[in-house]
């Protein structure tokens, strides 16, 4: 039963109910207490201020979206954790972000193409409420009364942006959107957008269409749940974060590249697409370090042929 908002908003949130009436089991939120030595480095002077003087890089392409056959998946990386996922009949945006700033953090690499080059979007998925994943300015521009799927507790942040129905999911819950099956998967992270809203959910998405499954991890530190996710789904393409593993707070809230390789092997996926690197300087590590470390780790584990390094704005048919 949709949960009505005020008449002013004229939007509904649909919360999926577990079949047995019990609340789905949630993974443990990461500890928010920083490491004891976190204060020994100064993120403001060593990262934020120097970034202000760095020119944005990256080419913006006039995207040439190919004609997609039934059973094919076309994936376009926009940058950071943002992807356009296309099949022969639908277009899906995941964690779209075209903004030049995350509050005081400068975007250092441009999106792969301008937002007005997007095809008509049928569905939008947002993994959690952090500013780099839930960008209200971008969502407001792409909203055209299509459904949006978010974790439980995030619906009130997006319901007034122009989406017809907001689907809130808890872990392992699923919603059917036309030919698309979307499930929220566990992760090891946290979901607060501000300091006092720790109730907000967070997770990844397993998206199944035409018999193929794409897994977008969202944000996560490494945790045993990746093996469980691999048990639940036969994953063809895994979009895994590899950056921001040296955050200014010292909290271990993101995987490093070596852990991402381990997560990929436990997921037992076929293709590894790295993301969440090279766009915003969210950690102390150099902007180009995550990809270098990933490629080295992939070689050492013999999976380099399974790693697909994408260029922002260039569609790839899989």
Locate predicted features.
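Zn-dependent metallo-beta-lactamase
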Residues: 1-93, 98-100, 292, 314
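Pre-active-site segment of Zn-dependent metallo-hydrolases
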Residues: 21, 54, 58-70, 78, ...
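Metallo-beta-lactamase
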Residues: 50-70, 150-212, 292-318
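Active-site-proximal beta-strand elements of phosphoester/diester hydrolases
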Residues: 74-77, 91-95, 181-187, 213-219
């Amino acid at each position: 039963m949709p949960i009505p908002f005020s008449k002013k908003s004229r939007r509904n949130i649909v919360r999926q109910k577990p079949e047995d009436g019990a609340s789905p089991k949630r993974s443990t939120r990461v500890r928010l207490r920083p490491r004891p030595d976190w204060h020994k480095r100064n993120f403001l002077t060593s990262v934020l201020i120097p970034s202000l003087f760095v020119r944005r890089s990256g080419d913006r392409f006039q995207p040439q979206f190919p004609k997609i056959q039934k059973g094919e998946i076309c994936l376009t990386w926009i940058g950071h954790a943002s992807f356009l996922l296309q099949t022969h009949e639908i277009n899906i945006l995941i964690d779209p972000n075209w903004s030049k700033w995350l509050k005081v953090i400068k975007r250092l690499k441009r999106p792969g193409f301008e937002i007005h080059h997007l095809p008509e979007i049928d569905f939008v998925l947002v993994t959690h409420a952090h500013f780099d994943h839930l960008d209200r300015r971008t969502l407001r521009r792409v909203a055209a009364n299509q459904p949006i799927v978010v974790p439980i507790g995030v619906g009130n942040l997006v319901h007034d942006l122009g989406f017809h129905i907001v689907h809130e999911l808890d872990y392992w819950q699923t919603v059917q959107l036309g030919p698309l099956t979307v499930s929220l998967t566990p992760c090891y992270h946290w979901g607060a957008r501000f300091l006092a809203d720790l109730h907000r959910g967070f997770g990844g998405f397993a998206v199944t269409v035409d018999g193929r499954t794409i897994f977008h991890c969202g944000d996560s530190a490494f945790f045993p749940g990746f093996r469980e996710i691999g048990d639940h789904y036969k994953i063809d393409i895994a979009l895994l974060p590899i950056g921001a593993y040296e955050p200014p707070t010292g909290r271990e809230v993101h995987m490093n590249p070596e852990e991402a390789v381990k997560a990929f092997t436990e997921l037992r996926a076929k293709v590894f697409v790295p993301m969440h690197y090279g766009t915003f300087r969210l950690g102390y590590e150099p902007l180009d370090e995550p990809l270098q470390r990933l490629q080295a780790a992939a070689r050492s584990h013999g999976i380099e042929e399974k790693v697909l390094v994408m260029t922002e704005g260039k569609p790839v048919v899989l």
